UniProtKB/Swiss-Prot annotation:
It is a single-pass membrane protein. This is Membrane-associated protein TcaA. The chain crosses the membrane at residues 51-71. It comes from Staphylococcus saprophyticus subsp. saprophyticus (strain ATCC 15305 / DSM 20229 / NCIMB 8711 / NCTC 7292 / S-41). Residues 72-461 are extracellular. PANTHER family: MEMBRANE-ASSOCIATED PROTEIN TCAA. It holds the Pfam family TcaA_2nd. Residues 1-50 are cytoplasmic.
Length: 461
């Protein structure tokens, strides 16, 4: 095809007359037309060659702009902080664990849950978003500052925001880490704690009244489901701690377990010497004290309780009581019953017996104290040796004291109680003690059944 030189209409290559305007095309015109077509084609090719590079360059620029914005959406400091903020706001513990974990400290989902709760309660979501974005902006604009902290209402550091190199040579790579503190427990008794930490089962053994670390934790309000084992059994419950109640480097842990403490009350035991009472709970024995709480014991098992104590050196036992699980409380009072009539009958008998030889014991102490003081003043052990039971510790220590010429004075005791068991006499009285104070003293004497031939076996204050 070619063009008519007059009207520009289309003509076949061999056609000599234009079908549109009737113009006769000569060979000369044909040659001109061919040259014109070639020139137009050449001009078009030159234009095309000039336009294509610009088009490619424009396309590359557009592509780079698109790539930049895509990278910015996912890798800019603002985008990085948005991932953190969204994880906290949406309770996405898995994502938050990934963001906060470092090579030296793995954050599990339990910690992430506690962290989210703490941020929302102690920082506030709006404040958290504002503070994180402010720290990001300041770090971006600073050439020297490398890190900053987001804090809770009480001033506790909860998040460290820091620069950590660059991403794609363009954006600051931001690092988000949560500071850690050591959680410590101080049990009242030896205990072993088992709980989940770092997605693994952890076991911590703690000694009675000693501070023991259970691990390092990021800021949070924690409630760890825990099994505790003690000599009294196994307990289910929680270990609780909150960074609001933390120290500089540690957090005190409180315990909340299904524990029952037993408080024993005695009935029919007015004549029992309370200092001699022993309380038996299951297979363990404890010293008795009024209002004393004994335990803890698991609320999941029945508990058997009994007691025994002395009246006039004779041991009496209470009836045994079983406390069912349904009746076990945090503080469970248990009343133990002694046979009051039996005890009173025995006490009356012993007091009558005591009165029968009280004069003999009183006379013995009058002679003994005089002899003891004379022996010390004259440094002559023979003056008192006949009043002492030979080869006893008391005999040897008295002999040593007399021979040392140590100043000494012993006062005759005012007898308050005499208890006879076989040929042994237990005497309690009030006298001047070695420290110069007036108070209770105890003697153990040995003699025959009628309180004759008495000898001192033991003395204590």
């Amino acid at each position: 095809m070619r063009k008519c030189p007059k009207c520009g209409g289309n003509m076949r290559d061999k056609q000599s007359k234009c079908g549109h305007c009737g113009y006769e095309v000569t060979d000369n015109h044909s040659e001109q037309l061919t040259r014109s077509l070639k020139d137009n084609k050449k001009s078009a090719n030159i234009k095309a060659r000039k336009i294509i590079p610009w088009g490619i360059a424009f396309f590359i620029i557009i592509l780079l702009i698109i790539i930049f914005f895509l990278l910015k959406n996912f890798n800019s400091p603002e985008a990085q902080s948005e991932l953190l903020i969204n994880a906290v706001d949406n309770n996405d513990t898995q994502k938050l664990s990934t963001i906060l974990s470092t090579q030296n400290n793995s954050v599990d989902e339990t910690e992430a849950t506690a962290y989210i709760k703490y941020i929302k309660n102690e920082v506030g979501m709006d404040n958290f978003v504002k503070d994180v974005n402010q720290k990001i902006k300041k770090l971006n604009e600073s050439e020297t500052k490398e890190a900053d902290f987001v804090t809770a209402k009480n001033g506790e550091n909860v998040l460290r925001v820091s620069k950590n190199g660059r991403r794609y040579l363009i954006f600051d790579n931001m690092s988000f880490t949560a500071p850690t503190k050591e959680a410590i427990v101080k049990p009242k008794y030896d205990a072993t704690y088992k709980f989940k930490s770092d997605d693994k089962q952890k076991t911590v053994t703690a000694e009675k009244n000693k501070t023991t670390a259970i691990g390092k934790f990021i800021p949070g309000d924690y409630l760890l489901e825990t099994k505790k084992e003690t000599a009294n059994g196994q307990f289910d419950g929680q270990l609780k701690f909150n960074f609001n109640n933390s120290n500089n480097e540690t957090i005190d842990v409180s315990e909340d377990f299904n524990e029952a403490y037993i408080q024993v009350e005695l009935s029919g035991a007015s004549e029992i010497d309370k200092d001699t009472v022993k309380v038996k709970i299951n297979d363990k024995t404890y010293d008795y004290a009024k209002a004393k709480e004994i335990g803890p014991y698991p609320k999941t098992n029945d508990i058997t309780v009994s007691a025994e104590g002395e009246a006039k050196k004779k041991t009496f036992k209470s009836a045994e009581t079983t406390v069912k699980t349904d009746n076990l409380k945090d503080k469970t009072k248990v009343t133990l019953n002694f046979d009051d009539d039996e005890i009173q009958s025995y006490v009356d008998k012993k007091e009558k017996e005591e009165n029968s030889f009280r004069n003999k014991v009183t006379n013995f102490f009058g002679n003994f104290t005089t002899a003891m003081n004379s022996a010390h003043s004259q440094s002559d052990f023979s003056l008192v040796s006949s009043y002492l039971k030979k080869n006893t510790d008391n005999y040897k220590s008295t002999k040593s004291d007399v021979n040392s010429n140590r100043l000494f004075f012993i006062q005759q005791p005012q007898i308050t109680e005499i208890i006879k068991q076989g040929n042994t006499f237990y005497v309690t009285g009030q006298a001047l003690k070695e420290n110069g104070q007036y108070g209770e003293v105890d003697y153990q004497l040995q003699g025959d059944g009628d309180a004759d031939n008495l000898k001192v076996v033991k003395y204590s204050e």
